[in-house]
A protein has these predicted regions:
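Conserved PLP-anchoring active-site segment centered on the Schiff-base-forming lysine
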Residues: 61-113, 117
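Glycine-/small-residue-rich active-site loops that bind phosphorylated ligands and cofactors
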Residues: 9, 27, 79, 102-103, ...
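N-terminal "arm"/small-domain region of PLP-dependent enzymes with the aminotransferase-like
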Residues: 1-25, 30
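Short beta-strand segments
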Residues: 3-5, 51-52, 129-131
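Phosphate-binding glycine-rich loop
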Residues: 25-72, 86-88, 96-98
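Active-site phosphate-binding strand-loop segment of PLP-dependent enzymes
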Residues: 102-138
Length: 138
């Protein structure tokens, strides 16, 4: 098997999961607001919101950025469907930017070319969702 990624799970991580499993709450218990506060502090943000999936997180991000019907969202052709669906959930138009053949990430050259064309057509995207393939940042 070709290893795609490796996890770094400590004994403390395992114990934290066991503590929740042995508690009265699997969801919406006291660990959730503690987690949200810890993440917010780490990110130097006022708030943090725990959600059930990256799909939900992307949807909330689109809502927070005011994405709506008639707007455009662009994302990578090499991604899970959530990268596009988050825009569809807001009624936006979806389009894709091709990938770089070496990194498999969204191509900066293709993005630039597409932005130039979109400006001429008055179809500049409100949001671009880059996808960091296999841990590589765009």
């Amino acid at each position: 098997m070709i290893p795609y990624g490796r996890q770094d799970i400590s004994e403390a991580d395992i114990q934290a999961v066991l503590d929740v499993l042995n508690s009265d709450f699997l969801t919406q218990g006291p660990q959730v607001p503690l987690f949200e506060k810890t993440v917010a502090n780490y990110c130097n943000a006022e708030y943090g919101v725990a959600v059930n999936s990256a799909t939900s997180a992307l949807h909330i991000a689109c809502l927070a950025l005011g994405l709506e019907s008639g707007d455009w969202l662009w994302t990578s052709t090499n991604s899970f469907v959530a990268s596009a669906n988050c825009g569809l959930y807001c009624g936006a138009n979806i389009d894709f930017v091709d990938i770089d053949s070496k990194t498999y990430n969204l191509s900066v050259v293709e993005l630039e070319n597409k932005l130039i064309k979109a400006k001429l057509e008055n179809k500049i995207p409100k949001i671009v969702v880059p996808v960091h393939f296999a841990g590589q940042s765009c």
